[in-house]
Regions:
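Extended, loop-rich substrate-binding clefts of extracytoplasmic carbohydrate-active enzymes
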Residues: 91-167
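Acidic (Asp/Glu-rich), glycine- and aromatic
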Residues: 51-54, 60-63, 164-211
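Beta-strand-rich N-terminal accessory domains
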Residues: 28-89, 188, 296
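Bacterial Sec-dependent N-terminal signal peptides
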Residues: 1-29
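Beta-strand-rich recognition/accessory modules
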Residues: 244-299
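Beta-strand elements of well-folded, non-transmembrane domains
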Residues: 138-144, 158-163, 177-181, 202-206, ...
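Short, well-ordered beta-strand segments enriched in hydrophobic/aromatic residues
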Residues: 39-45, 49, 171-179, 291
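Polysaccharide-binding surfaces and accessory modules of carbohydrate-active proteins
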Residues: 36, 41, 182, 188-244
């Protein structure tokens, strides 16, 4: 009887140790937590980002889906803002254009979500060694009246999150827009600023700095020309803690080594301007835009 109890105790201890060991393995690496709102990506139990799948609005206005918020820094603090009071149509990490044209006529304003809606129609996740990729398909639907809408553009986006390595993290964005009709084009604001395209709505501490090609950059009201990367450095974790940085890199569609940027020190977004004021047509092969974020400490 005593021998049986000893064997049973050993067996239960083995099961407990196996469970603890298995749980630790599961907790290591990347994990994707799905909910009705979207998908949260974590690494080793620490939050990395959230991809908004369900359309989200502010009191029924500025409804949007298919963007990243929150984005977390390497210390687990939130870097981005969503529906800020000063510009409630800004959404974390997002891409949008004022001019969405069909046969030369503006049919929607994607920047302020006027006459357009976004519907995430497909999602897929893939884990590889040292990375996780989120594949999404998003339908851009133009409102035609009486509560009806028509799909106009199909977006295919891949967001790839790399493991934190040497105290930095790389996140890649690969965005392709396919027109569902002929003669569709997209463009930025129809003014001298021409803003529109890939944007970051970051929290902006008072000590924010902009660095491109190892040179401090001073924002201006209109777009400035700088290198294809811009480092945003600030006390994102609080004024008493060390600074950290978010580097945004564009993989230029054109071979121009410079890039137009809209930069703001307070209450606004940061924007890689593309294509600018003049709309660019969407070919049936798709318009591809690639960007990279690098989260890093400041030495």
């Amino acid at each position: 009887m005593n021998l049986t109890r000893i064997h049973l105790t050993k067996f239960l201890l083995f099961v407990l140790l196996f469970y603890i060991h298995s749980t630790s393995i599961v907790a290591q690496g990347f994990n994707a937590i799905e909910s009705k709102e979207g998908i949260e990506i974590t690494e080793n139990g620490r939050k990395v980002l959230f991809y908004q799948v369900k359309p989200k609005s502010l009191n029924g206005k500025y409804e949007r889906a298919g963007y990243v918020h929150p984005l977390y820094d390497l210390n687990g603090n939130i870097l981005t803002e969503d529906f800020p009071a000063d510009h409630p149509y800004h959404h974390g990490i997002f891409w949008a254009w004022h001019q969405i044209k069909l046969r030369g006529h503006v049919v929607a304003d994607g920047w302020v979500a006027d006459s357009i809606s976004w519907n995430v129609t497909a999602l897929n996740l893939k884990k590889d060694s040292g990375r996780i990729s989120l594949f999404s398909e998003v339908s851009w639907n133009i409102k035609t009246g009486a509560g009806k809408s028509t799909p106009l553009i199909r977006e295919e986006t891949v967001i790839t999150v790399c493991s934190e390595n040497k105290k930095q993290r790389i996140i890649d964005f690969d965005i392709v827009l396919y027109p569902l009709f002929d003669s569709i084009s997209i463009g930025g604001s129809d003014d001298v600023k021409g803003y529109g395209g890939f944007c970051m709505r970051l929290r902006l501490p008072a000590d924010i700095e902009f660095v491109s090609n190892d040179t401090l950059v001073t924002p201006s009201e209109t777009a400035i020309r700088a290198g294809k990367s811009m480092d945003f450095r600030a006390s994102f974790d609080g004024p008493s803690l060390p600074k950290s940085g978010v580097t945004l890199i564009t993989m230029p569609i054109e071979k121009d080594p410079q890039q137009s940027w809209i930069l703001r020190k307070e209450t606004s977004m940061q924007n890689i301007v593309y294509p600018g004021r003049t709309p660019v047509p969407l070919s049936r092969r798709g318009l591809r835009m690639k960007y990279q974020l690098v989260l890093h400490p400041i030495d």
